[in-house]
From Swiss-Prot:
Keywords: Aminoacyl-tRNA synthetase, ATP-binding, Cytoplasm, Ligase, Nucleotide-binding, Protein biosynthesis. One of its GO terms (molecular function) is proline-tRNA ligase activity. It is found in: Cytoplasm. This is Proline--tRNA ligase.
Length: 580
């Protein structure tokens, strides 16, 4: 493609609204433009990269036996009401009414639609297994869309759905998709890691996320340092090993004693005032889970994992108690809640609290705490369980080795759904014995547009983006320094045509711009390779070749150029862990 005929509206300065590097560079490189909050236009360069990601994903889905379909983005509300997600999904589901007053939504995901499609066609075990996928625009009405393509309201996604006759078949489908994802992300050239994850609003009993590793990632991943173990999970899912040793739940403890703590609301203030360490205090945190009051107890120096609490209770929606609810349930202002005399029946405690007794806690009374709390003697705990966020001081829950944290960007998620949707929507089939059974499902998502942003987050420098050759807008840019020297320009065009004949997706910068502008734009956009054609080099029988990833420049001879170029290109692909 001749860039003199291309649309590349690059920017010299970072847009004021852009916070993360991928957002800045996608805007500056002329790849996207904002339409409104969280919604972007894909310009030619940006769409080219998105399409390359989609092509790789499509190839791996097809190779794994999935079949491509295309489903409507606008979905009838009655399907979502069948599964109960019309109310549960919350405000991220953009709801609309047609002229007849019927409810619809813009699809954030397609479990309901695909289940409706399959239940109308599949009647026998002979038609299973079945795996259908699409690559399509999704819409989620994020409360705070930010970071460009990283967390927009509208995005491009690949979503696949498997249907099997039993759990064994569903496991095979899940593993097939898991391996297909690994192949796709490897082919793209990303440094990624699959991790255990919570299933969230999608539901199901087991899932993995695929994260692109980047220091700027939103998500924190707990990883076992022992590579043989391989344990990795996001913080929502990461388990904390159960305490070892004897339980102190019913150990001897002095009688409860109230102590005045005037104006001391936080753990830090209370412990400093009483002259004790934070690990001697029990925090009482109050929530509603699907509207039901729930209390959770953790050690004063720990952070509660509300996802673990929600899953333990068995609910969908968890919310921190309001100030009014705290006063109603404790009889005290915020900051003085405790488990003794609490007007909440369901109290859960982190299992770490079994290892000690004689705790300090709120007294459910203003400006007052209690000392000598025994959880076994003084209050009724429904269940002790893993409720806190893992730390780097905790051992690996699988092997006991050390844990370390790393940052990641979620670009894929695979779920075992079981019969969650097939039962609620009556998607059944007749088995070998003629009995009606619910289909066993799985769903598998990849953020196609998000991968483009993630690649930049992982690979960039002060000059711009550094794309893997597989998904760069163009793999190589031929830069002519000829200016008005038509002989140089003609030679540059010869190289461009030769590269195109070799199957290289090349751009030819034939714009009437200064060399500095061309070099700056090439670095900004992130073409993996640059081929510079100048009069001086041609006289010396060479052209200059630049590796964008390393910045290394070499000279390729005019005589024997093709073989020298192929060898150089192969080295660059190999540096990305790829085969040219």
């Amino acid at each position: 493609m001749r860039l003199s005929r291309y649309y590349i509206p690059t920017l010299k300065e970072d847009p004021s609204e852009a916070e993360v590097v991928s957002h800045k560079l996608l805007m500056r490189a002329g790849m996207i433009r904002k339409l409104t909050s969280g919604i972007y236009n894909y310009l030619p360069l940006g769409l080219k990269s998105v399409n390359k990601v989609a092509a790789i994903v499509r190839e791996e889905m097809n190779r794994a036996g999935a079949l491509e379909v295309l489903m409507p983005m606008v979905q009838p509300g009655d399907l979502w009401q069948e599964t109960g997600r019309w109310d549960y999904y919350g405000k991220e589901l953009l709801r609309v009414k047609d002229r007849h007053g019927r409810d619809y939504c813009l699809g954030p995901t397609h479990e309901e639609v695909i289940t409706d499609l399959v239940r109308g066609e599949v009647k026998s075990y002979k038609q299973l297994p079945l795996n259908l996928y699409q690559i399509q625009t999704k819409f989620r009405d994020e409360i705070r869309p930010r970071f460009g393509l990283m967390r927009g309201r509208e995005f491009i996604m690949k979503d696949a759905y498997s249907f099997d006759k039993d759990e064994a078949g569903a496991e095979e489908s899940y593993r097939g998709m898991f391996e297909a994802y690994k192949k796709a992300f490897s082919r793209i050239g990303l440094n990624f890691r699959p991790v255990q994850a919570d299933s969230g609003a999608i539901g199901g009993d087991f899932s993995h996320e695929f994260h692109v590793l980047a220091d700027t990632g939103e998500d924190t991943i707990a990883v076992c340092k022992d590579e043989k173990c391989g344990y990795a999970a996001n913080l929502e899912k990461a388990k904390v090993a159960a305490p070892t040793g004897e339980s102190m739940l019913n150990a001897e403890c002095p009688a409860i004693e109230e102590v005045a703590t005037p104006g001391k609301h936080t753990v830090e203030e209370v412990c400093e005032f009483l002259g004790v360490e934070q690990d001697k205090l029990v925090k009482t945190l109050l929530f509603t889970v699907d509207g039901e009051p729930v209390a959770a107890l953790v050690r004063g120096d720990r952070e509660l994992n509300d996802v673990k609490l929600r899953n333990l209770v068995g609910g969908n929606e968890i919310e921190m108690a309001s100030e009014e609810q705290v006063k109603e349930w404790t009889g005290a202002p915020v900051g003085f809640a405790g488990p003794v005399g609490l007007k909440i029946e369901r109290i859960f405690a982190d299992h770490e609290l079994l290892t000690e007794t004689d705790w300090i806690a709120g007294a459910n009374k203003g400006d007052t705490h209690i000392k000598h709390l025994s959880l076994g003697r003084d209050c009724k705990i429904e269940q002790f369980a893993d409720l806190r966020v893992i730390t780097e001081a905790d051992p690996c829950p699988e092997c006991g080795a050390a844990i370390e944290f790393t940052k990641g960007i979620e670009v894929g998620h695979v779920f075992k759904l079981g019969s969650k949707y097939s039962k609620s929507m009556e998607a059944t089939f007749l088995d070998e014995n003629g009995k009606t059974q619910p289909m066993v499902m799985g769903c598998y998502g990849i953020g196609v547009s998000r991968i483009v942003a993630s690649a930049i987050e992982q690979n960039n420098d002060e000059n711009g983006a550094i794309f893997p050759p597989t998904i760069a807008p163009f793999e190589l840019c031929v830069i002519s320094l000829g200016g008005k020297d038509e002989a140089v320009n003609e030679k540059a065009e010869e190289f461009y045509n030769e590269l195109m004949e070799m199957g290289i997706d090349a751009a030819y910068d034939d714009r009437k711009e200064r060399p500095g502008v061309k070099f700056a734009d090439a670095d900004l956009i992130g073409y993996p390779m640059q081929l510079v054609i100048g009069g001086k080099g041609l006289k010396n029988g060479i052209v200059e070749a630049k590796n964008r990833k390393t910045g290394e420049k070499i000279e390729l001879p005019l005589e024997g150029f093709t073989e020298a170029f192929k060898a150089w290109r192969a080295e660059i692909w190999q540096s990305w862990g790829l085969k040219a």
